[in-house]
């Protein structure tokens, strides 16, 4: 068993992702923040025994962040020379590894067309910094993740989206969520786990209604909360892992109200 693997009662999510990987299809994981998209990519990487190189997208992402950069290095003869340091895209291509592009719709649209040749049948790239044409080694594949409707995201270009096959990754719940908490956190007390799962369900409802951000109701936040509960009171653990991350006082108060109802 893969340690801290992605778990979902809908086995088709992982099985389809693995099938798409074996078909050398680009995979786009779409779902709310903290639903386990990165964990799914990591589990797939381990299952197919292929290392993964990650790009974390933001509005500041540029070609150097993707491809690499030039720098000055002293060679064995003591002379300085200009060398190119491969970035995550080129590393993954050369080694036949997985390229994971997280929050791809956080990047500026004008940054991503440089990957068009990487994402289509050519699987190749002309490095604009060196002129080298890089052809991906066998085994290379691309997985991207998208948080639709999240603050700071941009609509994904249709031409780019059409280069992927989409898998929806929703939040998990019930017994599966209980198993994930036990597997990925220090908390093992069933009664407390059921309490915080109910609390998390309330947060998800509030998130869907626009009262709080998605991140506050994420699986990631729940795992952090589960760990902290083993060393401090529940209310303080919630404050540290969820409330103190929020800037909006109305969101903070909404969660405090949920605490009073659940604990």
From Swiss-Prot:
Keywords attached to this entry: ATP-binding, Nucleotide-binding
Residues annotated to bind ATP: 31-38
Record carries keyword Transferase: no
Molecular-function annotations in GO: ATP binding; ATP hydrolysis activity
Superkingdom: Bacteria
SMART domains: AAA
Similarity section: Belongs to the CbbQ/NirQ/NorQ/GpvN family.
Protein name: Uncharacterized protein SH1500
Species this chain originates from: Staphylococcus haemolyticus (strain JCSC1435)
Lineage of source species: Bacteria, Bacillati, Bacillota, Bacilli, Bacillales
């Amino acid at each position: 068993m893969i340690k801290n693997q992605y778990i979902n009662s809908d086995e088709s999510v992982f099985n389809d992702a693995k099938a798409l990987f074996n078909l050398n299809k680009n995979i786009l994981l779409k779902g709310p923040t903290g639903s386990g998209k990165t964990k799914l990519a990591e589990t797939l990487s381990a299952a197919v025994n292929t290392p993964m190189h990650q790009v974390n997208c933001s509005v500041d992402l540029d070609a150097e962040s993707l491809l690499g950069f030039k720098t000055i290095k002293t060679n064995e003869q003591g002379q300085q020379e200009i060398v190119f340091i491969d970035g995550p895209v080129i590393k993954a291509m050369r080694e036949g590894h997985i390229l994971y592009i997280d929050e791809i719709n956080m990047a500026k649209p004008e940054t991503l067309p440089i990957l068009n040749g990487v994402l289509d049948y050519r699987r190749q790239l002309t490095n604009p910094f060196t002129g080298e044409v890089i052809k991906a080694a066998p085994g290379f594949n691309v997985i991207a993740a998208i948080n639709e409707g999240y603050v700071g995201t941009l609509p994904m270009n249709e031409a780019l989206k059409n280069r992927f096959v989409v898998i929806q990754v929703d939040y998990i719940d019930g017994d599966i969520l209980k198993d994930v908490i036990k597997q990925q956190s220090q908390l093992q007390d069933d009664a407390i786990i059921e309490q915080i799962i109910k609390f998390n369900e309330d947060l998800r409802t509030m998130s869907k209604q626009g009262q709080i951000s998605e991140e506050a109701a994420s699986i990631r936040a729940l795992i952090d909360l589960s760990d902290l509960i083993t060393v401090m009171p529940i209310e303080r653990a919630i404050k540290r892992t969820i409330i103190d991350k929020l800037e909006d006082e109305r969101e903070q108060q909404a969660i405090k109200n949920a605490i009073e109802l659940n604990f």
